[in-house]
Curated annotation (Swiss-Prot):
Residues 40-58, 111-115 are periplasmic. The chain crosses the membrane at residues 19-39, 59-79, 90-110, 116-136. It comes from the Bacteria. InterPro entries: DUF2919. It is a multi-pass membrane protein. GO terms for cellular component: plasma membrane. Keywords: Cell inner membrane, Cell membrane, Membrane, Transmembrane, Transmembrane helix. It comes from Escherichia coli (strain K12). It is found in: Cell inner membrane. This is Inner membrane protein YfeZ. Residues 1-18, 80-89, 137-149 are cytoplasmic.
Amino acid sequence: MKSTEFHPVHYDAHGRLRLPLLFWLVLLLQARTWVLFVIAGASREQGTALLNLFYPDHDNFWLGLIPGIPAVLAFLLSGRRATFPRTWRVLYFLLLLAQVVLLCWQPWLWLNGESVSGIGLALVVADIVALIWLLTNRRLRACFYEVKE
């Protein structure tokens, strides 16, 4: 059932709220290590050099894949969110938790001796903005808690 809280263009043909465009960008931000992994795998010759450029310490690369798991699951389940409503609701909290982990990750690396860089600062700012958006966007929360009638 369509709610009058949101504009009609925010609904698809089945009467479900469409996920906001910014949601997909936040998922890409959260799954950034996964994206790098796919790009490195696709570019066979330069894959190792690319991974070494962004992750000189290979342990950080493998640990960086962990907070991206909820984002990858959200990509995969977004088309089937009506089929798996409980999983979809839990995924919202996992995305929030992953965003907090990613927000703390970079400063933790800095405290452990990694040099501060422009890319690191940009990622921290982007993580702060993403967390605020995930917490405050009413349409996004409504997408995760749609009521079936």
